[in-house]
A protein has these predicted regions:
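Cofactor-binding active-site loop characterized by glycine-rich and histidine/acidic residues
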Residues: 3-10, 20-133
């Protein structure tokens, strides 16, 4: 995907788009193990921002991403260089970027989930909604 974006896809100005190959290489084994052996449906992941090519490739292998979007990596209508809930179509759980918010978002989401479960917040709210008024 990164090779295609930098070398095969036509570029009017000849500039390369980058792609952070080392970041992708460093997380490939972990993400492969997670997505194909460990994660359950309810699990959520914040992908290391510079490893989005690995995330998008895995989503393609799972049938959640198109080849055309992979070929258009980092271009209009293609997959994003940082996973984005609003711009990517392949099930990004948390938008991440270069400022490291992914780690904080997953931590706080986990804390909120634990709090609501321990305090039965959701069940209490549903009970109040369903009570005859």
């Amino acid at each position: 995907m990164v090779h295609n974006a930098n070398h095969l896809r036509h570029s009017i100005d000849g500039l390369k788009v980058g792609g952070h190959q080392a970041s992708s290489a460093s997380i490939t084994t972990i993400m492969t193990a997670l997505y194909f052996n460990v994660l359950k449906v309810q699990d959520r992941v914040a992908v290391k921002p510079h490893a989005s090519p690995v995330f998008h490739a895995i989503q393609y292998m799972l049938g959640r991403q198109t080849e055309d979007k992979l070929k258009a990596f980092r271009s209009l209508g293609g997959t994003q260089s940082y996973p984005s809930r609003t711009k990517d179509s392949d099930g990004v759980d948390f938008s991440t970027g270069s400022v490291g918010l992914g780690v904080a978002m997953t931590l706080f989401a986990s804390m909120v989930q634990d709090y609501t479960r321990l305090n039965e917040v959701v069940n209490k709210q549903l009970a109040n909604v369903n009570e005859p008024g």
